[in-house]
Amino acid sequence: VSIPFSPTYLRIDTVRILRNVSNLVFTIGLPVFMYLVFSSGQTGDFQLPGGNGAALVAVNLATYGACTACAAIGALTAWERQQGWTRQVLLTRLSPVGFAVQKLLTALLVAAVPMVVVLGIAASTGAEASWQTWLTAGVTGWLGSSLFALFGLLVALVMRSDSAIGIASGSLVVFAFLGNIFMPLSGWLLDLARFTPMFGVANAASRPVTHGWLDRTTQVPLWQPWATMGAWFLVLGVACALMMRRTGGRA
């Protein structure tokens, strides 16, 4: 009888990934470095409804780090296929759907690390916001980042090679740009960005700080980022399910 969940596999997989130094450099070190660079200007003096500019930079980059971690872990499935690890796991009582659920949970556990580290460093180096704002923004960005675990898994299912990790992680840079994380967008580019997956996650996460304001004249409706995330969860979830059915759950 197949099982949908294995605490032992979840623990082993999470520890294995956290021991990979290169993963930690890109998911934790890079967002921290970018925060220190981007917040070194006048962001601390720029006030927003829920905090200062440094707090917004911190939430955006913590969300980026969490999303990068999730995408890389989802795409790691392609490498595990080549090494035969996925086949070994599926020889146990863990079902293919259960395996996908385990990957999602592993991604969330690992994604919590950059979220906590970046926000913690920010809160102690000039970023100002209430603890309720930090908590709400952090939890929202953390849960929203799971969307990119599905994206990474889909890339792995389509590519079925170790290049999937590079493609998935590299795509996050483009998504982050369109998600209004690296720089404010305007005009037609902003209109396009509203329909991209990272925009929904980043805007929902930063809303406790910005209250939805992108600039002095543009406010994103409360429903829009959640609708965007919901639509992308549906699209990527269905696509992953179809690809898994197409491969017959084979490793």
Region annotations inferred by a language model:
Residues 1-30, 84, 250:
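Aromatic- and glycine-rich beta-strand/loop motifs that create alpha-glucan
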Residues 3-9, 181-223:
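Short hydrophobic, aromatic-rich alpha-helical segments embedded in or entering the lipid bilayer
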Residues 33, 53-125:
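Hydrophobic alpha-helical transmembrane segments of multi-pass membrane transport proteins
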Residues 37-42, 158-199:
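Transmembrane helix segments
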Residues 48-77, 140-153, 157, 238-241:
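Hydrophobic alpha-helical transmembrane segments of membrane proteins
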Residues 96-166, 222-230, 234-240:
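Alpha-helical transmembrane segments and their short interhelical loops
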Residues 209-213, 226-251:
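Junction motif at the cytosolic side of a transmembrane helix
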